[in-house]
Amino acid sequence: MAPSRNGMILNPHFHKDWQKRVRTWFNQPARKLRRRKARQAKARRIAPRPVAGPLRPIVRCPTVRYNTKVRAGRGFTLEELKAAGINKRVARTIGIAVDPRRRNRSTESLHVNVQRLKVYRSKLILFPRKVSAPKKGDSTEEEVKMATQLTGPVMPIKIVHKKEKARMITEEEKKFNAFANLRMARANARLFGIRAKRAKEAAEQDVEKKK
């Protein structure tokens, strides 16, 4: 048994014909080939749809440790789809992932993903179900002929860093304590309801005293 994490180093006493029970991994090269062939078969099967699958939203990682990073999420919220003017049932049929459980907790995330949906919709080549009778929103014959299968990720997420010029640190910035401010902000958010309730009760008591 291989040592796992920070535990005691094992000293196994092998008996019982242990050579027969050795786990081998000689099937890995064949597995690699099998996975590759499966990917190619899927790409042929879903063509001309993108190989990478449906469009995913831009989300922030959870917790204070990772919330500065953005990555691809599971699916767009119903609020984002509504703002972009796309029906939630139609969205899945045109290559947009939908996750009804996710919630928008900031207007910034909502605007970013709505814009992403609009850009995707403008670039999308939608094949008509009946070539003889195309519906509203379907692409023209010329656009359909131009269509090729996308091999990379659909609208890859670009992480942009704003470069700032070097400058002197001000006295105000030197005095600023980021950790204490974050703790205070969290405490204020946590105690908001209790403080509001106490203030309301105090105001009611003042009114009663004046009577």
Curated annotation (Swiss-Prot):
Highest taxon in the source lineage: Eukaryota
Keywords, alphabetical: Cytoplasm, Ribonucleoprotein, Ribosomal protein
GO molecular function: RNA binding; structural constituent of ribosome
Localization: Cytoplasm
GO biological process: translation
InterPro entries attached to this UniProt entry: Ribosomal_eL13, Ribosomal_eL13_CS
GO cellular component entries: cytosolic large ribosomal subunit
Role of this protein: Component of the ribosome, a large ribonucleoprotein complex responsible for the synthesis of proteins in the cell. The small ribosomal subunit (SSU) binds messenger RNAs (mRNAs) and translates the encoded message by selecting cognate aminoacyl-transfer RNA (tRNA) molecules. The large subunit (LSU) contains the ribosomal catalytic site termed the peptidyl transferase center (PTC), which catalyzes the formation of peptide bonds, thereby polymerizing the amino acids delivered by tRNAs into a polypeptide chain.
HAMAP family associated with the record: Ribosomal_eL13
Subunit structure comment from the entry: Component of the 60S large ribosomal subunit (LSU).
Family: Belongs to the eukaryotic ribosomal protein eL13 family.
Protein name: Large ribosomal subunit protein eL13
Organism in which the protein naturally occurs: Ictalurus punctatus
